Amino acid sequence: MSNTKHADVSKFLSYVLRHKPEAIGLTLNSGGWANIAELISCAAKDGRLLTREVIQSVVDNSDKKRFSISADGLSIRAAQGHSSAQVDMRYEPKVPPEFLYHGTATRFIDSINQQGLRPGSRQYVHLSADEATAITVGQRHGKPTVLKIKTLEMHQQGFIFYQADNGVWLTLTVPVPFIDSTPFID
């Protein structure tokens, strides 16, 4: 499969499995799982040709491990990033490392310095374990910058953290005092 086709299918899967399953008539269960046969059928009705092999290829070759296929091979879900309140991934709370990183665009820094980090349309704020990943995330929205987050200190003060199957760290919010005041700019 070409890189362009792979990217198109990945974006489509992200859209329907994270944000708008109803756009193609797909139903997710409360854990975010969709039946693969139903996904293929709904996609076909929407004019998109998906096969089990194409879906498996996208799952296997995703560097960010955005999707998971169930143990029985019948269902698929997005690892994290859901905007739908009906999806509850039931992550287990986890103690974070001392620091995690948040990639964003420099144009958002003033707002972040006033409000902290908020999930926006997602359920959680997403944090990365390393600066390189955070830079990649930040550059999707403009000139990237990386914020260093005092996550262990947050945890010690009662904030809850989760880690998605693909390694992305999640929390409900990051108040300003826990954000390193000097962002790293590439």
From Swiss-Prot:
A molecular function GO annotation: tRNA 2'-phosphotransferase activity
List the GO biological process terms. tRNA splicing, via endonucleolytic cleavage and ligation
Q: Which domain of life is it from?
A: Bacteria
The residues forming the signal peptide are none
Keyword Transferase recorded: yes
Q: Which InterPro entries match?
A: Ptrans_KptA/Tpt1, RNA_2'-PTrans_C, RNA_2'-PTrans_KptA, RNA_2'-PTrans_N
What are the entry keywords?
NAD, Transferase
Instruction: Provide the E.C. number(s) assigned to this enzyme.
Output: 2.7.1.-
NCBIfam families named in the record: PRK00819.1-1 (NF002012), PRK00819.1-4 (NF002014)
Annotated family: Belongs to the KptA/TPT1 family.
| Chain's role | Removes the 2'-phosphate from RNA via an intermediate in which the phosphate is ADP-ribosylated by NAD followed by a presumed transesterification to release the RNA and generate ADP-ribose 1''-2''-cyclic phosphate (APPR>P). May function as an ADP-ribosylase.
- This one is known as Probable RNA 2'-phosphotransferase
Q: Which organism is it from?
A: Pectobacterium carotovorum subsp. carotovorum (strain PC1)
Output the lineage of the source organism. Answer: Bacteria, Pseudomonadati, Pseudomonadota, Gammaproteobacteria, Enterobacterales
